[in-house]
Curated annotation (Swiss-Prot):
The lineage of its organism: Bacteria, Pseudomonadati, Pseudomonadota, Gammaproteobacteria, Legionellales. PROSITE patterns: CHAPERONINS_CPN60 (PS00296). Keywords: ATP-binding, Chaperone, Cytoplasm, Isomerase, Nucleotide-binding. One of its GO terms (biological process) is protein refolding. Coiled coil: none annotated. This is Chaperonin GroEL. Forms a cylinder of 14 subunits composed of two heptameric rings stacked back-to-back. Interacts with the co-chaperonin GroES. ATP binds at residues 29-32, 50, 86-90, 414, 478-480, 494. Transmembrane segments: none annotated. It is an enzyme of class 5 (isomerase).
């Protein structure tokens, strides 16, 4: 396919146009006075959002060279979202500022590689200073404040996230779901819950809740399908004699085995419920082992030389209570040994450190939380579907921000932390004048988040930036109220991880753009077939269809 080429300054100008066009649309969402952006959907209601990365992902330009510049900044926003979960608009605004200032320097004849080295030195110095300024985020009040700011100053969201973290711990799993009412709701699932329900509705013993509830049950864990009742006859007889109920967790229970269990349950011979094991493949085996450790049981597996025929009551796990619904199984107060559970948690955490997959890390984190004791579910309430989507996105952003705050601490929000970190650049020198220019580019760029927050609130950015820079510590400007003061006391906080990640990712794209000398894109295809489709002469005979009788 034929290609179109652009070189030198022409290429950089096209790329810069894409960066500016994307950033202009994203920057409008920044700060407490940021505006919403409405995104069209191919079906259903449009999406209303203030999330920078959501806006960026929707933007495509017809001009392919312009689009390349926009795509690079999209990557900055997406990487920031993946790493820190928030700060995507900040990253976009910083990236644009660095690229624009860097482009001016390259146009003036400066060496792009030396500019890059100068910017890198400045980013390293600022990052270290941010980490020095960072304060631990330990108490519920600070967590609520971080969540409130990230959720566009919605105190209800900040408070419910802080409450959820308090109940399940800072490493607990917190999920966000659509609610049924107008108010946000928080429910906490005690013990271990996995997303598998009863195999047959005939196991239900609580008709009001449509659930199977087992008090002090035995738990049989099997890593294969159970098709014949003969395999598990000895276990069933032993459980029936004990008079206690039985939960069976297996790859599947089918055919004769399922029919026999249902009949025994309905006749009251043995109170039983069967569910499929959670997960797939190796993850299923790992989760079965988690349940075994939590309930002080053993997984019946041919891989380790155990079989159903030889299983006894000693092989079974136990728990205080189990509730099985159509979709979930919850094991409450498993009778596993604390030392074994803690050892299993440590083992899973070690796997989290080693894995490079975000998906695997998330699944491992869920397993830790389930073993450690609890999952919190935030149900988002809203009047309409459009409001629900927008509110749910804000809750998820706030949740990511609070996790980041717990992980690396907090700094003064509203762009103030970057202004305070600016002082470390005063004594920083490059190896030559071009590197010094790179340091100065970053010095100006890190003012851009505060400038944008102030501009979106309708104030004069230069005056406010100068006044904030003249003061010390946490002194800043509250764009929501139009007042100056201590940002920490006013509850305006940013997670250190979010600010650091936004800066590092924004700076990473500038070297690619500043050192670009050639751009290559496919030539647009001509619509060759459209001209011949005009008369569609062969369709004339369709008129004869009028004589066809209706059936």
């Amino acid at each position: 396919m034929a290609k179109e080429l652009r070189f030198g300054d022409d290429a950089r100008q096209q790329m810069l146009a894409g960066v500016n066009a994307l950033a202009d649309r994203v920057k409008a969402t920044m700060g407490p006075s940021g505006r919403n952006v409405v995104l069209e959907r191919s079906f259903g209601a449009p999406t209303v959002t203030k999330d920078g990365v959501s806006v960026a992902k929707e933007i495509e330009f017809e001009n392919r060279f312009k689009n390349m510049g926009a795509q690079m900044v999209k990557e900055v926003a997406a990487k920031t979202s993946d790493t820190a979960g928030d700060g995507t608009t900040t990253a976009t605004v910083l990236a644009r500022s660095i690229v624009v200032e860097g482009h001016k320097a390259v146009a003036a004849g400066m060496n792009p590689m030396d500019l890059k080295r100068g910017i890198d030195k400045a980013v390293t110095a600022i990052t270290k200073e941010l980490q020095k300024m960072s304060k631990p985020c330990k108490d519920g009040k600070a967590i609520a404040q971080v969540g409130t700011i990230s959720a566009n100053s919605d105190q209800a969201i900040g408070s419910i996230i802080a409450e959820a973290m308090e109940k399940v711990g800072k490493e607990g799993v917190i999920t966000v779901e659509d609610g049924n009412g107008l108010e946000n709701e928080l429910s906490v699932v005690e013990g271990m819950q996995f997303d598998r329900g009863y195999i047959s509705p005939y196991f239900i013993n609580n008709q009001q809740n449509m659930s199977a509830e087992l008090e002090h049950p035995f738990i049989l864990l099997v890593d294969k399908k159970i098709a014949t009742i003969r395999d598990m006859l000895s276990v069933l007889e032993a459980v029936a004699k004990s008079g206690r109920p039985l939960l069976i967790v297996a790859e599947d229970v089918e055919g004769e085995a399922l029919a026999t269990l249902v009949v025994n349950n309905m006749r009251g011979i043995v109170k039983v419920c069967a569910v499929k094991a959670p997960g797939f493949g190796d993850r299923r085996k790992a989760m079965l082992q988690d349940i075994a450790i939590l309930t002080n049981g053993q997984v019946i597996s041919e891989e380790i030389g155990t079989s159903l025929e030889t299983a006894s009551l000693e092989s079974l796990g136990t728990a205080k209570r189990i509730v099985v619904t159509k979709e979930n199984t919850t094991i409450i107060d498993g009778e596993g040994k604390a030392t074994e559970i803690n050892a299993r948690i440590a083992q899973i955490r070690a796997q989290m450190e080693e894995t490079s997959s975000d998906y695997d890390r998330e699944k491992l984190q869920e397993r830790v939380a389930k073993l450690a004791g609890g999952v919190a579910v935030i149900k988002v309430g809203a009047a309409t579907e459009i409001e629900m989507k927008e509110k749910k996105a804000r809750v998820e952003d706030a949740l990511h921000a609070t996790r980041a705050a717990v992980e690396e601490g907090i700094v003064a929000g509203g762009g103030v932390a970057l202004i305070r970190a600016q002082k470390v650049l005063d004594g920083l020198k490059g190896d030559n004048a071009d590197q010094d220019m790179g340091i100065n580019i970053l010095r100006r760029a890190i003012e851009s988040p505060l400038r944008q927050i102030v501009a979106n609130a309708g104030y004069e950015s230069s005056v406010i930036v100068n006044k904030v820079a003249e003061h010390k510590d946490n002194f800043g400007f509250n764009a929501a109220t139009g007042q100056y003061g201590d940002m920490v006391e006013m509850g305006i906080l940013d997670p250190t991880k979010v600010t650091r990640t936004a800066l590092q990712n924004a700076a990473s794209v500038r070297s690619l753009m500043l050192t670009t000398e050639c751009m290559v894109a496919d030539l647009p295809k001509k619509d060759e077939g459209m001209a011949g489709a005009g008369d569609m002469g062969g369709m004339g005979g369709m008129g004869g269809m009028g004589g066809m009788g209706m059936m």
